[in-house]
């Protein structure tokens, strides 16, 4: 009976001491993995950022191209005052200073080309 207790106590002490060593070893492994994970996450983040920038560039390029089927929006018609620096005349019109009529308004108007 006494030997059983001693054996049990010895096994218990060995299990606890080896468990602590494993715990410290596991902690070190976890630190290494988190450091590797951070570098992997940084790499993945940079890759995702590059893909998003490429996608954004494609979308902006598509927006800048005019479709034949799309109509022109928010343009100024013929004979309507326009801003010299930011003309928004419809296609086929140009923002020019008036010739005879409208001189007294001191403004630019949309005229046909």
UniProtKB/Swiss-Prot annotation:
List the subcellular locations. Answer: Secreted
Q: Name one GO molecular function term.
A: sodium channel inhibitor activity
A GO CC term attached to the entry: extracellular region
What are the record keywords, sorted? Disulfide bond, Ion channel impairing toxin, Knottin, Secreted, Signal, Toxin
Covalent S-S links between cysteines: 75-90, 82-95, 89-110
Q: Which InterPro entries match?
A: Toxin_22
Its main localization is secreted
Q: Which residues form the propeptide?
A: 22-74
Extract the ranges annotated as region (Disordered): 61-82
Which stretch is the leader sequence?
1-21
Record's superkingdom? Eukaryota
Annotated Pfam families:
Toxin_22
Please give the tissue specificity annotation from the record for this chain: Expressed by the venom gland.
This chain's function reads: Probable ion channel inhibitor.
UniProt comment concerning the protein's domains: The presence of a 'disulfide through disulfide knot' structurally defines this protein as a knottin.
Q: Which family does it belong to?
A: Belongs to the neurotoxin 14 (magi-1) family. 01 (HNTX-16) subfamily.
**Protein name (database record):** U11-theraphotoxin-Hhn1f
Q: Which organism is it from?
A: Cyriopagopus hainanus
Phylogenetic lineage = Eukaryota, Metazoa, Ecdysozoa, Arthropoda, Chelicerata
């Amino acid at each position: 009976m006494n030997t059983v207790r001693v054996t049990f106590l010895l096994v218990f002490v060995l299990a606890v001491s080896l468990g602590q060593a494993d715990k410290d070893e596991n902690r070190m492994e976890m630190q290494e993995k988190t450091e590797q994970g951070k570098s992997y996450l940084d790499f993945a983040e940079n890759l995702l950022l590059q893909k998003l920038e490429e996608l954004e560039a494609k979308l902006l390029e598509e927006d800048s191209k005019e479709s034949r089927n799309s109509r022109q929006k928010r343009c100024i018609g013929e004979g309507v005052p326009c801003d010299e620096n930011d003309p928004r005349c419809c296609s086929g019109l140009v923002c020019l200073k008036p010739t005879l009529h409208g001189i007294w308004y001191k403004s630019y108007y949309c005229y046909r080309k």
